[in-house]
Amino acid sequence: MEPNQIIELFYFFEDSFIGQYIRGSTWLFPVIESFHLIGLAVLGGSVVIGDFRLMGLILKREKIGYVIKQTRTWFKFGFFLLVSTGVPLFLSEAVKCFYSRAFWIKMICLVIGIAFTFLVRNPLVLKNQDGKLIPLLGFSSFLLWTIVAASGRWIGFS
């Protein structure tokens, strides 16, 4: 797909019924964004607790596997809330997102973060909870999710 075809797709998204409806409302965007931020807090909290445990910074008496399993449900709920609110927010300003470097950084790191969490971090941690690689996995995960959150926040300023 060429860049001009991609921008046409983004115009299509922005011109959708949902995009127009959100843009035409005074309160809808901030209400949706409020729930988006709640999702960020839930997902972010689960990331901080899980990754800080992997790095050995908190909950040192709790087994790593137990902490990861306990935070997984909250992670999934936060992610669901973020996606279900992020899509309509995106539709309301898709063209702006197309030209936003922060948006593309967020999307790339989001895909990497999800893949890393479910295909690398969690399986490795649950198989080998005492390895020397565990703190590095926690740090890498925390760094990825921090980039996702920071770049997402920066979209509002770009």
Model-assigned labels for residue ranges:
Residues 1-158:
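Polytopic transmembrane helical bundles with strong interfacial aromatic enrichment
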